[in-house]
Amino acid sequence: MKKELPTKYDHLAVEKGKYQQWLDKEYFKAGDLTKKPYSIVIPPPNVTGKLHLGHAWDTTMQDMIIRYKRMQGYDALWLPGMDHAGLATQAKVEARLREQGISRYDLGREKLVDKIWEWKEEYADIIRAQWAKLGLSLDYSKERFTFDEGLSDAVREVFVRLYEKGLIYQGEKIINWDPVQRTALSNIEVYHEDIEGHMYYFNYHIVGSDDILVIATTRPETMFADQAIFVHPDDERYKKYVGMKAINPANGDELPIMADSYIDLDFGTAVMKCTPAHDPNDFQLAKKYNLPMPKCMNEDGTMNDLAGKYKGMDRFECREALLKDFEAAGVVDHIETIVHSVGHSERSHAIVEPYLSKQWFVKMKPLAENALKNQETDDRVDFVPERFEKTFSNWMNNIEDWCISRQVWWGHRIPAWYNNETGELYVGREAPKDVENWTQDEDVLDTWFSSALWPFSTMGWPNTEDPMFKRYFPTDTLVTGYDIIFFWVSRMMFQSIEFTGRRPFKNVLIHGLIRDEQGRKMSKSLGNGVDPMDVIDEYGADSLRWFLLNNSSPGADMRYVPAKLKSTWNFINKIWNSARYVLMNIDEDQKLEELDYATLNLADKWILNRLNEVIRSVDENMDKFEFINVGTELYRFIWDDFCSWYIELSKLHLTGDDEAAKKSALNTLVYVLNTIVRLLHPIMPFVSEEIYQAIPHKEESIVISKWPEVNPEYDNDTINDQFAYLIDIIKGVREIRHTYVIKNSIEVDYTITTKQDDLEALLKEIAPYVSKLVNATCVGYNVPTSKNNATEVIKGGNTLNIDLGQYIDMEAEKAKVEKEIKKLEGEIKRGEGMLSNPNFTSKAPAAKVEAEKAKLEDYRSKYAAAKEKLSKMN
């Protein structure tokens, strides 16, 4: 039975059911040991919620690569998985509980973790459904979760080994503290915003003197923990006060006045209060001079006992109350309004508090040095684009120790125990044998600690004999955004080199962020976020995937433009209709076969040569990850060369009496269309499968079909030049018909003026195509032209000529054009007058002014066209 495609392209119908069919057939399952391996691990999405448009972009690029490699004959593994995302996921669950009036402390650790597991299962199912809707060819038999038993073993192994090497240690330092989540944050979990604030200048009275020191601060609430006052030893204004004391106006404490060259002579009054427990620079000074380091805040950002009557207040409430009291007491010298950079928690968005705390840290310098050295070897990771390697190396060269402990309950517990009697610390892969005498550290590890092991922990490490590890590690390509080069890419690199001795991936493709049409970052606050599932419902996954890949260059941001989705849908509809045309013309026993090149006509040879050029270009750009070039090449070939030209030209043979020419055209149509859908498959998996199944094909599914290869027999160095004559003549006839309003139903005669002796045979060969497409007949070469001759320059400086006197009344047509020019001159004069009149431009509604501007532009455009037309007629 002859296969057909429905009259209308319906993306919902086309995409329905295919993904499950592919899964049932296990097309995505890796493990064919006869093939060369190629592996990608998915950047595991957080189980915090649904996937967003950025995830769709990132995973579509990976799917395009993996489908391409699978079709090229690789044993292509795309390993899926998800991240437990400790702090972020716990924050989501706590927010849900708060809506029910429940806090995590009401539930306790065990029950809260149970609730988070429920959340994880709920959103893991949602994420898998979204992956399916996007058409991602993931090998689910190898799916991993960062909290899986095997991955948790790897986390403990890494922690213990680093600890035993002295690269993990406990220390009391100033860290970034999130008072909402009540946990430490690493530096890169803090984002900075420029916000308006104040610089407060307060009077400190010198003990035993009437003199006053004016000291500036942006955080008056920390004054209760001040331990000293510092000036510069070379500052003549304050030398006499060194060794004396000044009274802290917040609590009456007498603070020693000390000198240190660290003090910035140009900042404020060049007198600095020292608050060791609430400022990293003050902390260093306090260590240098052995000062006490008390804290005046609790972990939730409220004031503690040191704050006296302000105890229990939120830190910012305390600031306002203290300021009010200072103003009443005459402590305030003056206040400046400033704009300064303030750190915020990436998760809770709370203002981060520099806070003295005992935490676990990774000593980063040796690990970073190893990663940088590895980049100088053959085992280097290649960054695409290259400029991001500089981003990586700059960060690694200036890296600080990594705070890895988090005061939350969802995450990998730190494998450290404290003896209940002696306080002795034990770190190990397993709990102590007499575990009842020990208490495990309450903290969990930073989510990125386990994520950093993802490329090798998912492959069975620390068992380096695991078949997965031996076959698929290092992985080939990582695809990720530039926003997590520090968070994730860098950490995977140094951990992989430390624990496997090899790079985690051979290359990393870096992309940007998706922004809205105005270039703004998508966010909940702006309400400009886009759910990719909604886009798929409206336009289809193939349209979304094409848009994402055809509008992205490595390393660059992308703008989401809804109108482009509609254009993409129209493009797929064009492909659909071209397939229907082919199917309508072939018999049910039509085969996909190699073509007999000697029997092919000019159009057949041209489209096959162009197809070779496209395959070469697509291969080159796929290998360079230049997906926008892939899309551009395919679009031009399909829309222009195949649909607009070749299909139209094929009608000459399909409707003619020459059976051999008809068979040649049909075979070429089938061959080219089959190749097109295979080239499209990595980008448009659903519609390519639908068309592939309808037309003659070789494999059970396009998923496992062979990637198109160049056929050298179809290369033709001269065919494009020859075909250009045909295109130019057809375009020339169409242009003359349009300019002089000659209906397509009227057959026109044309001549060609040329100085090329060898052109006549070619022009005779293409004449039937010209006749078929534009109803025009060639009546001679290098013949005299009439005074009413219209010309169009074609390839090689030759000219196409049509005697207009045969088809139109030239004088009447000229008169019409001259009349139109006069009318347009009047409209232009009127429009220019209105728009130069301030009474109109300042008083009329803006919309009306813009409308007049648009009209004037239109009149000018029409005027220029009419003048050009008259010039040609003359």
Features from the language model and the residues they span:
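N-terminal, positively charged nucleic-acid-binding surface of large information/translation enzymes
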Residues: 1-234, 258, 275-288, 292-307, ...
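Active-site-adjacent bridging/hinge elements
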Residues: 34-42, 64, 100-102, 128-135, ...
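Structured ligand/cofactor/substrate-binding pocket environments in proteins
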Residues: 54-66, 73, 82-83, 151-154, ...
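Secondary-structure transition/capping motifs at alpha-helix termini
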Residues: 67-75, 96-109, 129, 133-138, ...
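Short, polar/flexible loop-turn hinges at active-site or ligand-entry regions and domain interfaces
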Residues: 100-114, 381-382, 533, 554-566
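Short Cys/His-rich metal-coordination motifs, predominantly Zn2+-binding knuckles/fingers
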Residues: 181, 251, 348, 419-422, ...
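Short acidic-hydrophobic surface loop/beta-edge motif
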Residues: 200-207, 244-249, 343-347, 417, ...
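Feature 926 captures the class I aminoacyl-tRNA synthetase adenylation module centered on the KMSKS loop
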Residues: 201, 394-449, 453, 498-541, ...
